Design a protein with these regions (language model features):
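Positively charged n-region of N-terminal signal peptides that target proteins for export
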Residues: 1-4, 19
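Generic structural motif
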Residues: 4, 34-36, 92
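Sec-dependent N-terminal signal peptides
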Residues: 4-15
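Intrinsically disordered, low-complexity boundary segments flanking structured domains
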Residues: 17-18, 69-75, 101-102
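N-terminal secretory signal peptides
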Residues: 19-64
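Acidic/histidine-rich, surface-exposed loop or edge segments in extracytoplasmic proteins
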Residues: 48-53, 75-86
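Tryptophan-paired
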Residues: 60-75, 79-80
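Surface-exposed, polar helix/loop patches in the mature regions of secreted/periplasmic/lumenal proteins
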Residues: 79-131
Length: 131
């Protein structure tokens, strides 16, 4: 009986240790700020069809690499030392709420110069899952 319980527990642990990453459609936008001046940048809300999501944590796989894509693009455009974040959601409605909240924070105060990074000049490329 002990062997049966032990082997069942071992199987359960091994199954939960490997969380599957599944491609999914997500909506995302990027935000960049510089600590050197008062300029902030927003990308458009973009739909990415094949972004990988960790099925266990529901978190975007390799999110930092999406932020690096934005950082590299802004540096090519002459933006000095941008600090970038990428925000995602599974529904258009949720991402629009997040976008509006963050944008309002920077436009209402009048302290920041808000710039747009439009879709034709910048689009997120899906990050491939690597095991």
């Amino acid at each position: 009986m002990k062997k049966y319980i032990f082997s069942l527990a071992l199987i359960m642990v091994s199954l939960t240790a490997f969380a599957a990453n599944k491609p999914a459609k997500v909506y995302m936008f990027g935000f960049a700020a510089s600590f050197n001046d008062s300029t902030v940048c927003f990308t458009d809300i973009q739909e990415v069809d094949s972004a990988y999501i960790d099925s266990k944590t529901k978190f975007l796989y390799s999110r930092e690499n999406y932020s690096y894509q934005l950082r590299d693009h802004l540096e090519e455009q002459g933006f000095n030392a941008p600090t970038c974040i990428t925000i995602f959601a599974f529904s258009r409605k949720n991402i629009e709420k997040k976008y509006a909240r963050l944008r309002r924070r920077y436009t209402d105060s009048g302290k920041y110069i808000v710039k747009e990074v439009s879709s034709p000049s910048f689009a997120y490329q899906a990050i491939k899952f690597e095991e």
